[in-house]
Design a protein with these regions (language model features):
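P-loop/Walker-type NTP enzyme "switch/lid" segment
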Residues: 1-73, 79
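Structural beta-sheet core signal
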Residues: 2, 75, 98, 134-136
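Catalytic P-loop NTPase motifs of RecA-like helicase/translocase cores
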Residues: 9-10, 80-82, 104-106, 120, ...
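Generic structural signal for small/hydrophobic residues in well-ordered secondary structure
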Residues: 11-12, 94, 113, 167
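Short glycine-/polar-rich loops that comprise or flank the Walker A/P-loop
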Residues: 92-96, 127-132, 159-162
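Beta-strand-loop-alpha "switch" segments that mediate conformational coupling across diverse proteins
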Residues: 138-170
């Protein structure tokens, strides 16, 4: 399941609405969707539209009403810590996955976030977070891997965990 807290754009929820519109308006897409879900023997994962303040309550409500309980609930949070409720909600996450791209500003921002969160909330016991992982997104195959290696060394020097998976630029 996904709780889309990235108010006001709610891009994940918007994508699902777009998908549902395509399926509802096209017998071709309706047949594809039916065949897909019949083949995998599962329904589409639930997406709940929320905000950072109400995210945890909305997630609990969703879990309580689902016939099949999700194994994992992902929370898509706003990109700024200044948004209401973000820090409080993040402090209740078991794991945090932070996207980074090969842009100096993005990397510095991610480093500042991870250091601040770790130093002020995790090590003090105020957060229940078990781990924070960075992952590369918007990876352009034409970019030199040296850039990723350089940033990778910087992350390693700070003992930050980086997932091996890199999401390509779409």
């Amino acid at each position: 399941a996904v709780v889309d807290c990235d108010d006001p754009q709610h891009s994940i929820h918007g994508l699902r609405e777009h998908e549902m519109g395509l399926i509802d308006s096209s017998t071709y897409f309706k047949a594809l969707a039916c065949d897909h879900f019949r083949r995998i023997k599962k329904n589409a994962y639930t997406i709940v539209k929320s905000n950072a303040v109400n995210a945890l309550d909305d997630a609990e409500r969703m879990i309580a009403t689902e016939d099949v309980k999700p194994d994992v609930v992902f929370f898509d949070m706003p990109g700024t810590l200044r948004s209401n409720g973000v820090i409080k909600t993040l402090s209740q996450m078991d794991y945090i996955f932070t996207p980074v791209s090969a842009d100096r500003f993005v990397v510095e921002s991610a480093l500042q976030f991870v250091m601040m969160f770790n130093d002020n909330l995790v090590t003090t016991g105020l957060a229940k977070t078990k781990g924070i992982s960075l992952f590369w997104t918007m990876v352009d195959g034409r970019e030199k891997t040296g850039l990723y290696d350089l940033y990778g060394k910087l992350f390693a020097e700070n003992d930050f965990h980086v997932l091996d998976t890199r999401l390509p630029d779409s």
